[in-house]
Amino acid sequence: MSDVKFRSIVATFPCQVQWGDCDPAGIIFYPTYFRWMDAACWAFLAAVGYDAKRMRAEHFAMPLVSADCQFLYPAQQGDRCVVRSRIARFGGKSFVVSHEVVREDGMALAKGSETRVWGKFDQGPGSRLRGQTIPAELKALFRAA
């Protein structure tokens, strides 16, 4: 993967901590952040024209190969948050999306990243998936002005 940082647009994904997102102590259960980051990544791609329907129709996929999260401050039921996502780095066939989860009052709750591979199914979903070079046109959709 290239070590050159990418100057990315930033997408926002709103979310709210629900009762089922909390552990017995009444604070957010850590897997919720990973669920939100995954949803934010898919929403980010959809915002530039690559929604799940198009990805399936064109046999593209972006499997997750790594994810991490630092938990900075506990969220509680009812907290309204936003996930701010950007492309941190593009490699030849992989990319890194960085995420920051911020409560509506500006408190940073968590930050994390996902490494994904750009791939294409040989004959559609369910067939063999092969890594593909990320098209320059796709990268351009995420480039900040």
Model-found features: residue ranges?
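Catalytic strand-loop segment that frames the active site of acyl-thioester-processing enzymes
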Residues: 2-47
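HotDog/MaoC-like acyl-thioester-processing domains
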Residues: 2-7, 13, 76-80, 87-145
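Residues that recognize and position ribonucleotide moieties
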Residues: 11, 26-27, 60-62, 107
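Hydrophobic residues in beta-strands and at strand termini
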Residues: 15-19, 71, 118
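Hydrophobic aliphatic residue packing
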Residues: 17, 27-28, 64-65, 83, ...
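Short loop/turn motifs enriched for small/polar and acidic residues
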Residues: 20, 65, 100-102
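Alpha-helix initiation/capping motif
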Residues: 22, 26, 60, 127-131, ...
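Hydrophobic beta-strand-centered segment that forms part of the acyl-chain substrate-binding groove
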Residues: 44-95, 109-111
